[in-house]
């Protein structure tokens, strides 16, 4: 329905900001400790200095690993990684080696000791600055200390990263989705017509 007939109803307060990136967070300082955690409660919180966050339940296996090492890697996921992304969110690293089970490759990060995931098109190395207890989740506020990009997604002419072609995965209210078509670019609504 449109116009005056458009109906809305009140719902109880809840977490309804969607879509969100569905990322794999890798952590651990030694191969024996390496683990992967699926996270949708993540995002950018500052441009300069570059900072981001992940929110994790204290009972999750990765929580103690991240708290102990104070670093992690946010690995963006793709359509090809969808099964691994879901699986790593419903299985515990206490019982499984998630890298082996999902045939993901732990790679060497440049700055942090936590591994990156080689299959990810973009890996964001993070160092925890502050942990904020919020309720069901604690927020790990982190400085971005390095970004590693898969060169296959670099435009050789412009040098720009073209992540849209990598079939990024997003999370919407319990479901995983690919990105749709491009609608515009930042600032297009105010550009002067040539």
Language-model region placement:
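Basic, polyanion-binding surface patches
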Residues: 2-194
